UniProtKB/Swiss-Prot annotation:
Entry protein name: Nickel/cobalt efflux system RcnA
Record topological domains on the Periplasmic side: 1-12, 78-86, 196-209, 273-274
Annotated source species: Escherichia coli O9:H4 (strain HS)
Region ranges (Disordered): 127-153
GO cellular component terms given for this protein: plasma membrane
Keywords: Cell inner membrane, Cell membrane, Cobalt, Cobalt transport, Ion transport, Membrane, Nickel, Nickel transport, Transmembrane, Transmembrane helix, Transport
Location within or outside the cell: Cell inner membrane
Record's function text: Efflux system for nickel and cobalt.
Membrane topology: Multi-pass membrane protein
GO BP terms, alphabetized: cobalt ion transport; response to cobalt ion; response to nickel cation
């Protein structure tokens, strides 16, 4: 952080605001940040571009607010809470959360797939011993989706969103609330930058850089939401292998998230031991 501190003292960091926005956008492509939930939400409510923008801005507000709360809370709790000492601990804590999330995702996906296979075998056994030679004519159809597996994580989000919003018009307050809860996980890098700015009495610059970083993150979230609403169904129709890839995606995601968590944990531990 020596180079960045020097830039701040020279007053040249203002020129890096566009770069910070770009870094925030790239940071949004990393695992996490509730991109899956937000994309699923936009698809479920058949959201418009305006609603996707609103969702991303709400996530930006909560993301920025949490960064400020953690930074100022740490400054109040301990006068010796410096950026150099805070960053490794934040990385280590984040690593524990990320690795735990990766294990949970992998276990839940595996368990959901196993339960689905057991239900399928039981369903096939019943049909083998009972010939259904009667028809149900009740004026409505019983639709059972036994033929396609959906991972437990995606199914839980889909069922929850469908139960809450299916058949009803979604209000702006509901969209804002969903976006606010999606941005509650702070970024250690953004907190560190803000702490450095506070220590150098560059509070306005620190606020601007954090907001710029969050704007970049919001752009990614908005793009994901809008892109999901427009393209997912089209891709599924045109490419038969999309569903197969989607079934395996949680395993790859959990592995990638776990590797990121291990890297952050090692990096944070090395920083603490220095």
């Amino acid at each position: 952080m020596t180079e960045f501190t020097t830039l701040l003292q020279q007053g040249n960091a203002w020129f890096f605001i566009p770069s910070v926005i770009l870094l925030g956008a790239l940071h949004g492509l990393e695992p996490g940040h509730s991109k899956t939930m937000m994309a699923a939400f936009i698809i479920a409510i058949k959201g418009t571009i305006k609603q996707a923008v609103m969702l991303g801005l709400a996530a930006t507000i909560s993301h920025t607010a949490v960064v400020w709360l953690i930074a100022f809370g740490g400054m109040v709790i301990s006068k010796r809470f410096t950026a150099q000492s805070a960053e490794p601990w934040l990385q280590l804590i984040s690593a524990v959360i990320i690795i735990s999330t990766a294990f949970w995702m992998f276990w839940r996906t595996w368990r959901g797939e196993r339960n689905w296979l057991e239900n399928m075998h039981g369903h096939d056994y019943e049909h083998h011993h009972h010939d259904h030679e009667h028809h149900h004519d009740h004026g409505h159809h019983h639709h059972h989706e036994h033929g396609e597996y959906q991972d437990a994580h995606a199914r839980a989000h889909a069922n929850d969103i469908k139960r809450r919003f299916d058949g009803r018009e979604v209000t702006n307050w509901q969209i804002l609330l969903f976006g606010l809860t999606g941005g509650l996980i702070p970024c250690p890098a953004a907190i560190t930058v803000l702490l450095i700015c506070i220590q150098l009495k560059a509070l306005t610059l620190g606020a601007t850089l954090v907001v710029s970083f969050s704007i970049g993150l919001a752009l990614t979230l908005v793009t994901v939401g809008v892109g999901a609403a427009i393209s997912v169904q089209q891709v599924a129709k045109r490419w038969s292998g999309f569903n197969t890839l989607a079934k395996r995606a949680p395993y790859f995601s959990s592995l990638l998230i776990g590797l990121v968590g291990v890297y952050m944990g090692v990096h944070g531990f090395m920083g603490i031991m220095r």
